[in-house]
């Protein structure tokens, strides 16, 4: 089965519609998919009906529309939230997670995921993605692709943030002899494009996995696979340049664009190393890694510049350097703040108010005692990646949940059939 997380704007916005229609045309030629699940977010009932009509128009008959704003799906989300599973935050992570439940409910053995914004999609890419799992019995396959379009390099978060950060971490861990961290970093570096959203899972693996619900979902998924799978494949998704929608830079807004993506990716990576691998993070560690990151990024940018010149690609070195120093460096520092706060904040304040006489009157009324108490209360505080539980755990606690999902999907299918 195939899962496609889909926003209504993928087919209602004129600039996105041609890309989506091309995906449908290509999928109509694929014969080995039992079902194609469109996890539809941010859509009205009318837009859900529009999607159903579009699917029929372009020959997609084996579809399921998982309308997350529909009455049936809202009932399922409420049941899961009432059970304490924390699926109350809309977004791609929650959408995908429910799609995985739908796929399991109707008997999927293998579940693939692709994004709905691939401008250069071709059915052969899907064949490549499924082949290792479907034919060769791998548990997981991940797409590797060439992020070049309009005669320039894309994949900025991977090239300018993740790769140099991983190399900086490897350099630090190698020097300190911490091999367990080096093994994980080497595993992540082995993927040519760690942040691709195109993957296939064997169902027994997928049901044991947790999934992040922020922009760090891809790196979190790879680390989950590292822990829980034995046979992992990386496939060349396309021999042609791969193109999809690109995030705006949003340099002045840490809650949007590339800035937000970068913070989520770094905090997900580092917090996973803290929680699962026992990494100790301090202010010094964050500063040290940031300095090493800047050096490595500078080396890579020089290589990208040389590569672009040799390959006759457009390359704006100044823009790339500005991204590193103005966005990605700050994202690492911000992620470090998340991971070391709040107890380190009190430590800084204690140092400040005990070293300056201007704070005498505050010390006299007990501020130091309050700060020490706050520090003691929060010493063990850690940043946790927003994530789902596993479907294995949900099924264990609610054994009939898959039956309920089948019932809801059946009613939704009847609704879309009657509306023809």
Language model regions located:
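Catalytic donor-sugar/metal-binding loop of nucleotide-sugar-dependent glycosyltransferases
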Residues: 213, 222-240
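Conserved catalytic core of nucleotide-sugar-dependent glycosyltransferases
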Residues: 121-203, 207
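Active-site-proximal specificity loops/subdomain of glycosyltransferases
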Residues: 47-106
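Short beta-strand-to-loop acidic/aromatic patch adjacent to the donor-nucleotide binding site
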Residues: 107-119
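Active-site donor/metal-binding and catalytic loop motifs
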Residues: 235-256
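N-proximal low-complexity "stem/linker" segments adjacent to membrane-targeting elements
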Residues: 1-26
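Short beta-strand/loop segment that forms part of the nucleotide-sugar
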Residues: 32-44, 65-69
């Amino acid at each position: 089965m195939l899962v496609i997380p889909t926003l209504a704007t993928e087919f209602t916005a004129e600039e996105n519609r041609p890309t989506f229609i091309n995906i449908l045309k290509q999928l109509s030629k694929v014969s080995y998919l039992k079902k194609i699940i469109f996890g539809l977010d941010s859509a009205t009932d009318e837009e859900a009906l529009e999607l159903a009509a579009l699917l029929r128009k372009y020959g997609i008959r084996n579809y399921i529309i998982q309308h997350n704003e529909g009455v049936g799906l809202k009932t399922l989300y409420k049941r899961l939230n009432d059970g304490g599973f924390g699926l109350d935050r809309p977004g791609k992570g929650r959408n995908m997670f429910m799609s995985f439940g739908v796929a399991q409910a109707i008997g999927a053995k293998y579940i693939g995921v692709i994004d709905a914004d691939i401008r250069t999609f071709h059915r052969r890419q899907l064949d490549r993605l499924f082949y290792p799992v479907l034919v060769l019995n791998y548990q997981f396959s991940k797409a590797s692709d060439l992020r070049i379009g309009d005669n320039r390099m894309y994949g900025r978060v991977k090239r300018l943030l993740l790769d140099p950060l991983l190399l900086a971490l490897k350099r630090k861990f190698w020097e300190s002899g911490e091999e367990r961290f080096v093994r994980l970093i080497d595993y992540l570096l082995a993927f040519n494009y760690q942040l691709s959203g195109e993957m296939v899972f064997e169902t027994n693996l997928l049901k044991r996995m947790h999934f992040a619900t922020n922009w760090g979902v891809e790196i979190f998924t790879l680390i989950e696979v590292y822990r829980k799978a034995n046979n992992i494949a990386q496939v060349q998704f396309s021999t042609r340049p791969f193109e999809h929608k690109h995030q705006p830079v949003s340099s002045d807004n840490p809650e949007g664009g590339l800035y937000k993506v970068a913070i989520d990716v770094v905090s997900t990576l580092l917090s996973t190393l803290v929680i699962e691998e026992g990494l100790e993070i301090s202010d010094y560690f964050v500063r040290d890694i940031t300095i090493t990151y800047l050096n490595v990024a500078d080396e890579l940018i020089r290589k990208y510049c040389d590569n672009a010149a040799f390959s006759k690609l457009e390359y704006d070195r100044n823009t790339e350097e500005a991204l590193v120093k103005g966005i990605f460096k700050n994202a690492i520092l911000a992620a470090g703040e998340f991971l070391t706060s709040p107890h380190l904040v009190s430590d800084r304040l204690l140092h400040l108010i005990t070293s300056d006489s201007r704070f005498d009157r505050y010390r006299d009324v007990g501020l130091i005692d309050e700060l020490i108490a706050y520090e003691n209360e929060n010493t063990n505080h850690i940043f946790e990646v927003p994530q789902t539980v596993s479907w294995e755990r949900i099924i264990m606690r609610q054994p009939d949940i898959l039956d309920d999902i089948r019932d809801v999907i059946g009613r939704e299918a009847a609704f879309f059939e009657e509306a023809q």
